[in-house]
UniProtKB/Swiss-Prot annotation:
NCBIfam families named among the record's database cross-references: dph5
Subunit comment: Homodimer.
Alphabetical list of InterPro entries matching this protein: 4pyrrol_Mease, 4pyrrol_Methylase_sf, 4pyrrole_Mease_sub1, 4pyrrole_Mease_sub2, Dphthn_synthase
Top EC class of this enzyme: transferase
Source organism: Thermoplasma acidophilum (strain ATCC 25905 / DSM 1728 / JCM 9062 / NBRC 15155 / AMRC-C165)
Binding site for S-adenosyl-L-methionine: 9, 83, 86, 111-112, 163
Organism lineage: Archaea, Methanobacteriati, Thermoplasmatota, Thermoplasmata, Thermoplasmatales
Name this polypeptide is given: Diphthine synthase
Keyword field contains Magnesium: no
Amino acid sequence: MLNIIGVGLRGTGSITFDEFDALRTSDFVYADMYTSIGQPGLIRKISAMIDRDILPLTRDEIENGSILPQAASKNVSLIVVGDPLMATTHNELRYEAMNQGIGVRIFENASILNAAIGKAGLMVYKVAPPVSLPRISEKFFPLSVIDKIKRNADLGLHTPVLIDLEDQENIPLHDALASLLEMERRREYSGIIREICVLSRISFPDEKILFGRIEDMMQQEVNSPYMMFILSKLDDNERRFLSLFSESVSKVSDARS
């Protein structure tokens, strides 16, 4: 049996009774240490709570299905920060397990995406699928990121941007925004990226939500983990909610024309 267990965003406080029971009765417990960033000491705290060792897994170990031979005859659990099936990696693991006749149980929990949409005050029907922003260089400059943002903007949709990790930290905000602006320049798109909402350390004690124009956001520093929304035209309710739920970094934040 393979249990893929989402532990949400609030550390041990997000673990349900069913999840606790599944972890406590597992023969082996592993933790995904790549796809999401958990609260400091999370794995150590869960280990103490269930009174058993938790072994960290790299991305390659998860993608290679290294835990499936054990799951064929033992009760194996994989801990995932957030929701367990938001990353393709975990659905691939689920697929391979089922293909091999291994039973799979999924334990849902809150993800950064659904939490961020609500906390920012955005309308869920106006939010597009997320894009991932990697660290770019002259040798690796994926303009598909800005193409997706433009298509979403043309449809009046906000684009969630998930920021790549370097040494378990998100790329710094200034670098991420500079990359997006350079993509916009190379594609000769005008004014696609104007207003942004940045959400830092959602559900952590030092949670921060910032809202404003990109030129003002470039001057800000936020702690990892964070993600952002490239905002399309805001409706009256969204702008009203953002004005109260977030900290404005711009003196005046004009609506998208």
